[in-house]
């Protein structure tokens, strides 16, 4: 069969020749994204499987997310590329039904995995002691199973409604002619998980911030107490040497180097304690900023990738007069698919164990 679809038959040779470079460029770009998504998610899955240090219930959720995103890259993206380049569906309605089913289920499952990971992290930081006992591989398996079951229940009704209307043989889309079906699918697959993720990560950030401040206050109090004990026990050994005469006005002179003057109130030990305290406060602040950055990247990537698509789905299918070009619809769909490439990067790039595991895999040292 000719590479160009039937709609191209009415075009002149010059028009076909003019459109060919853009189609090749689109095909290569999307194929590159699909290949990158497949490779990166494969690395995450392999790293968790072969690295014993990564055999942790929290990482099982990340592994399941990587499997879901891998399926998007292997089973969804290639068919979408062919559909976009040819501008018509040529693989029959049976394969269309299978493709749409896998597309909706996997994308919904990927989004729900993000909710499950957020819930897991929230419980781990707010109920650390009790949840550490409950956080077992079995519990992670139950969460993963529930996520897949919910994804299927959310995805099936839109596919059912699709067969209630008439579909052309050269198209493979879901027309949400029923407002109930549109609201059910969009809210179940995105809007409700979005609200849940926003609430959970806000609470995680607040809890982490409070925890950092409590630890910081506890360390400072402990160091102050240790400093007092050191002063009392070492009072006799501290020499108050005054070999240099310093006038009173020099105390306010910024050029005076107080570190070299021996007749100061603080002992070297107290100064060392103060410096350690300051360094720990700095480390605590750095960790807090790192946590905020990580959460910001997770939420930002999720919202940027999926919000435009689901806004389009809701508006276009509820508002009869609202139309969108096929090119824009394809762009928004692939913007959502892009989240499957970003997910493994965000959830592993800040983890040193994952970095080391990736290096071993690349060097074949596993």
UniProtKB/Swiss-Prot annotation:
Motif (DRY motif): 120-122
PROSITE patterns per record: G_PROTEIN_RECEP_F1_1, G_PROTEIN_RECEP_F1_2
Keyword Disulfide bond: yes
Transmembrane stretches, start-end: 25-49, 60-81, 97-119, 140-159, 179-202, 292-315, 328-350
Annotated positions binding serotonin: 103, 107
Sequence ranges on the Cytoplasmic membrane side: 50-59, 120-139, 203-291, 351-366
Key words, A-Z: Cell membrane, Disulfide bond, G-protein coupled receptor, Glycoprotein, Membrane, Receptor, Transducer, Transmembrane, Transmembrane helix
Chief location bin: membrane
Listed GO CC annotations: plasma membrane
Listed Pfam families: 7tm_1
Membrane topology term: Multi-pass membrane protein
PANTHER family, per the entry: 5-HYDROXYTRYPTAMINE RECEPTOR 1D, ADRENERGIC RECEPTOR-RELATED G-PROTEIN COUPLED RECEPTOR
Protein name as it appears in the record: 5-hydroxytryptamine receptor 1F
